Amino acid sequence: MASEHSFDISAALDKQELKNAFEQAKKELDSRYDLKGIKCEIDLSEKENIFKLSSSSEGKLDVLKDIVISKLIKRGINPNAIKELSRESGAMFRLNLKANDTIDSENAKKINKTIKDSKLKVNSSIRGEEIRVVAKQIDDLQAVMKLVKELDLELNISFKNLK
C-alpha cells in the first residue's frame, strides 16, 4: 500500500468534447426555426479554443452564444470557463468566445490558499499550470476535491493522476 497518495488539479479541456459541442451547436443552428433566413455562422479554432460566432442580427448573436454554452454544458464543460473576447459590429455582428484551459497564477494561489486554510492533512504545491495535492489518506484527497469543486472559479476544473 502506498504511504502517500496524490492527484493533480488542472483546468484542461477535453478537445474532443469541445469539438462535439461545436458540431452539436452547428446542427442546432441549421435546424432552428427562429434562425431561418438570417445569416448565422459558428466556427471553432481548435488550437486556441475560440468559438467565432457571426450573425446579421445583433439579437441573434446572443441566441448563438446561448446555443454554444448550452451545448458545452451538456458535454460537461463548465460555462464559467468561457470568456467573451471581443464583440464587433458592422455589416455582420461578430463575437469571439474563448474556452479557458489553463489555471492562471491568481486562481492557482486562490485554490492553494483554500486548501491550506481547510486544515486538512494535505500538502499542495503549484506546478506550472497544475496544482499537486499530496496526503496520506485518500479520504483527505476526496475532501479536497469536494472543496475545490465548491469554489466559484471561472475554470473547467479537472482532477488527474489520482495515485
From Swiss-Prot:
Protein name: Nucleotide-binding protein JJD26997_1583
Alphabetical list of InterPro entries matching this protein: DUF520, UPF0234-like_C, UPF0234_N, YajQ-like_sf
Top-level taxon: Bacteria
Family the UniProt entry places it in: Belongs to the YajQ family.
UniProt GO cellular component terms: cytosol
Role description: Nucleotide-binding protein.
GO molecular function terms noted in the UniProt entry: nucleotide binding
Listed HAMAP family: YajQ
Organism: Campylobacter jejuni subsp. doylei (strain ATCC BAA-1458 / RM4099 / 269.97)
NCBIfam families assigned: PRK05412.1
